[in-house]
Amino acid sequence: MVTIVEVKQHIKKFAAGNELYLQEVLGCHYENDIYTFRVWAPNAQKVWLVGDFNDWDKSLEMSQTLDGVWEIKTSLPKEGQLYKFLVKQADGREVMKIDPMAFELEPRPGSAAVIVKLPNKKWLDGAWMGRNKRSNHFARPINIYEVHASSWKRHTDGSLYTLKDLQKELIPYVKEQGFNYIEFLPLTAHPLDASWGYQTIGYYALERTYGTPRELQDFVEACHKENIGVLADWVPGHFCINDDALAYYDGTPCYEFSEKWRAENKGWGALNFDLGKPEVQSFLLSSALFWLEFYHLDGLRVDAVSNMIYRDYDRSDGEWKTDKFGGNRNLEGIEFLQKLNRTIKGKHPECLMIAEESSAQVKITGRIEDGGLGFDFKWNMGWMNDILRFYEMDPLFRKFNFNLATFSFMYRMSENFILPLSHDEVVHGKRSLMNKMFGDRDKQFAQLRNLLTLQMTYPGKKLLFMGSEFGQYLEWRYNDGLDWAELKDELNAKMKHFDQDLNSFYLNEPALWQLEQREDSVQIIDADNKDESVLSFIRQGKTRHDFLIVILNFTPVDRKKITIGVPYAGKYCEVFNSARKEYGGSWNQEKQNLKTQNNSFKNFNYQVQLDIPGFSAVILKPVDVHIKRRINRKTKTK
């Protein structure tokens, strides 16, 4: 039972920006046959509780308590009934508003809150949670399958899959394909499917079309039992502009900036949170912790970080003002993100905090004490943009743009990166990942295999949007399922098989993930072979014997007896080849077994010669190499 004194303490912390469990005091709470409703509307003239239980009339007027919070206690409501707050705003208008703390909203097009009791689940994922707490995420494989919950698959009658359906089908599919994380586009309540969830109205409510809170808990638990982590996109920078939601809640700026130019997000038709306001900080910090703790999520991907840390983001000259230092930084946004990560990591250091951010000015994954934002990982948007431009162009011109394939090696240690081939790149006329590739259908599949091998062997964690694993031809459509019928086509089926083998290869080769935070985990063999458009590099594991040699051919020309430098004399064998017939290619030769020649190549004392099929990626591994043992000589002291 929460006492009056405890409620006051919670509200004081809320007003100071330090409340981490706001859902325990604001919103709807049931105790001893009495429901208590509280809502923050500091400049409202009056607030009424309206709902099914009082025919939506003004019979239940709320009382203002402290720090702008209104309260009422009543025994009239029943579980399952709908309610809203009728707010007489500062200008005298009376507007129906959602409960910002609601755990469930009614089906669309309505937005009323549903009176619910959250399930008190007895979790059975202790083994996963324990391993996760002991794990060093930077030195383990992370391979993320990005999913939009309502468009992965549909029933034959066109109806949506729920989380219960996804538990039966998505989890075994992800496990079979070799991904070890699922990342959902936002699961929070939103009024329009076309927003994909990024126009949030309910920061504590699961989107009703996806299922119930218990179904999400069960889904996460089932994932954990299969050693699959679950991440979700979360949008703390901007919110839906709808009049019945958070926008100008009491007729004045509550959640948004008071300065109109800062509040308006014209590009997205949204409103920006005032991240410097203490009450907003409490609201968002509590939301983040709620999703991580109540649903056992393993991390959050924070959307649109650039919009939160730059005043001039998506604004023309004259549409923004400088900060107090004369710069373009949103200082409040930077401080909030540092506070967010400090809070999450203080309570749950095992949870992944991931930033979607496209600039290179602020140290996103840097330590907070050094001025960084404190995220674990950042999407490598530079790599993604460069590499997709490279693969879209005619291979004849790739030698003139070879830096697009190699430049990201220069800054790979600047942040902890995730390499995203995400939903944003396969929609709005950008074409599917497969259909971006240059040439006819066979060449497109060959280059998609090449691209995914580059992604999997390049330093950084991995993310792939659903459908790309089998080479879907059409763009992603949020209002339909993936085109699963394409798997009847031999090329698509073989592409899916290829992705399965590639993911398994990644998960089982420590050289691809064990030392990613070290400079010496990657050695460039040859990044200058522009004329033949062949790139080669080494990925190094913990032991000197544990390394892989990656060779990528970005043209359709088979390269015979091409020379590659290697670090040690001995024997090497081919362990992966993206052009093999089983994957949809035409290469049917035996796996290559190679002996070194005592000729130097670039910075290497030895070399091998091998055949590289057109548009292929080939990976070599040492079989029997001669590595001189390092001798540590102790210096005698007098």
UniProtKB/Swiss-Prot annotation:
Enzyme class at the top of the EC tree: transferase
Protein's organism: Lactobacillus acidophilus (strain ATCC 700396 / NCK56 / N2 / NCFM)
Recorded catalytic activity of this chain's protein: Transfers a segment of a (1->4)-alpha-D-glucan chain to a primary hydroxy group in a similar glucan chain
Subunit note: Monomer.
Pfam families xref list: Alpha-amylase, Alpha-amylase_C, CBM_48
SUPFAM superfamilies tied to this protein: (Trans)glycosidases, E set domains, Glycosyl hydrolase domain
Keyword Glycosyltransferase listed: yes
Protein name: 1,4-alpha-glucan branching enzyme GlgB
Gene Ontology MF: a single term: 1,4-alpha-glucan branching enzyme activity
EC number(s) on file: 2.4.1.18
